[in-house]
Amino acid sequence: MTETVGKAAGGAATARELTFRGIALGGAITLLFTAANVYLGLKVGLTFATSIPAAVISMAILRVFRDSTIWENNIVQTVASAAGTLAAIIFVLPGLVMIGWWQGFPYWTTAAITGTGGILGVLFSVPLRRALVVDTPLPYPEGHAAAEVLRVGSGSREGAEESAKGLSVLVWNALASVGFAVLTQTRLVAGEAAVWFRTGAGATGISGGLSFALLGVGHLVGLSVGMAMFLGLAVGWWVLLPLLTAQAPQASDLAAWAGGIFSSQVRFFGAGVIGVAAVWTLLRIAGPVVGGVRSAIAASRARNAGHALALEERDLPISGVLLGSLAVLVPIAILLWSVIAGGPLAGSEAVLIAGAVVFVVVFGLLIAAVCGYMAGLIGASNSPVSGIGILSVVAASLMLVGLFGRDQDAGTTEALVAYALIVTGVVFGVATISNDNLQDLKTGQLVGATPWKQQVALVIGVVFGSLVIPPVLDLLNTAFGFAGAPGAGPNALPAPQAALISALAKGVLGGDLNWTMIGWGAAAGVCFIVLDEVLGRLGKLRLPPLGVGIGIYLPMSAILPVVIGSVIGHFYEAWADRRGDAEFARRMGVLTATGLIVGESLWGVAFAGIVAASGSDAPMALVGDGFATPALVGGTILFLALTAFLYRRTRKLVG
């Protein structure tokens, strides 16, 4: 696996890249990150990005080998991030337990749903690399951050002094981020706060999270996306929520009342905006995508004709991608047949399997492009893949309504709902891996990696993840169960996205889904598209409609720190542009943000293990709810002071 190459990033004559030890290390990291992501996703509906923590761990371990390289470390983070990202399948599969179709998670069926969708996600996004990674101005915030971590950790920058400064910034900011995150778990400082209040007959609220990771993400995504998300936040929380709560019966618990309406109505409005923005995104990138496919075909012909391509430009052969995609459809068809056989849908195998396979291919290709674009725009960890899951399950359910209608008995309807969830699970695997894949390939491009080797590593990561996820899911189901499932106990895991997606499938197939909010969201999405295009033509700051949709869809506590981070990043970059070495100053800014993300991400893994081992939601809490006000005041002051100190320190190091 070692070959002689001319690596652009380091100029090494011989580079170790796709090695057995790298794959083994990536697999070991996978066990930790995937299990942690599965638990956290079911508990709070969020997962964390694993690329940067995996890169940091890899560099720390492989540093003992004198022949380790930046490209080998890149392979490790690629394997680990693919498996960690695949854990987002928990946003769909627990729905099968919630509706009573499954009692647990059958190992091979769960692994097949997860693995086939993930591998298709890798293959479908191969021809997108040229269009969405090479020939694009998309920022890829996490891809850039991971590349900076690899560069600094490997010492590959020119000039020992610059490397030392960069590593210092990364480590200091990571330690500060970890320290603050630890304090929030003790509850001596608040990690999040929300205030709910009435607005006439309605209600709304203001909430914010004290998260250095989200602050760093805001710096990396930039002012345009940050302001688009702020517009979405304003529309969702300060326009829609007051209007909708004013029309609903009032309740004594203001937070539960308004929060419930946000989840059941405002989020659907946001999903409508995301859907229209996703379609518009697809139309805008259709030309580059077609060009990317043509480039891939041309590259394959050039290689067959004996013309050498630079290693940094070699993808998996397009012929292999096509054959591989067709080959993966075979186990998908077998999987679907096993679901149908002997049940209420028996006798309709041909039409159901054919319809589902066509749906997986067509819809999978569309969302692979859209999810790749989303990753480039705002980063994989902030992409609303659960919104894509909503659109997928609605589309899959409508396909089944078209084939069977709605006048079915209860047993057949339940079987159709389960079938829709399984098809959605495969498509969701395509979405999550496409979202992560292009982010990893951007990292590879920045460090001079070989694309086809990364694509192989991504497939390996998918296989690792698909083998780990089923037993973890089954263990958590046995120990806690899921809220809404038959026989669920008081400690059942909420699994909010799975609950929503399964409810949508039942609503569409049962004929009782309210399309009003999705329709209004779609109409608003068109308006946001027009606004963005007008701003672009006027040369003003653009407001990407997908960013607006995300701002509506996600909680304010997740959006506000990103918005603040984008403003801080804007002012920092304006300062950096006035320096003598603007590029170095900008890179130091990226490392500042990266350190903030790295620290909190690594702590997220550690704390997930503590929570799982202790069985307590707050195993490190030192004070109770009575300390909430001092914790909020003290936490806010400490957060602001640390932010100012860390950015000032970076500026002093830049000089």
Regions found by a protein language model. Give the residues of each.
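Alpha-helical multipass membrane-protein architecture
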Residues: 1-655
